[in-house]
Amino acid sequence: MNEQSMKPYVIGLDLGGTNSVFGIV
C-alpha cells in the first residue's frame, strides 16, 4: 500500500473504478 501513498492517482486509474475516488483525491 506504500505505492498508494506515493501515487494514489496511478492506483485509482489502474483499477479504473474501485479506487477511482481515491485516484481523484
From Swiss-Prot:
Activity regulation description: Competitively inhibited by 2-deoxy-glucose.
UniProt entry keywords in alphabetical sequence: ATP-binding, Glycolysis, Kinase, Multifunctional enzyme, Nucleotide-binding, Transferase
Keyword field contains Nucleotide-binding: yes
Pathways involved: Carbohydrate degradation; glycolysis; D-glyceraldehyde 3-phosphate and glycerone phosphate from D-glucose: step 1/4; Carbohydrate metabolism; mannose metabolism
GO molecular function: ATP binding; glucokinase activity; mannokinase activity
Enzyme class name: transferase
Function: The enzyme has great affinity for glucose and mannose.
Protein name: Glucomannokinase
Organism, scientific name: Segatella bryantii
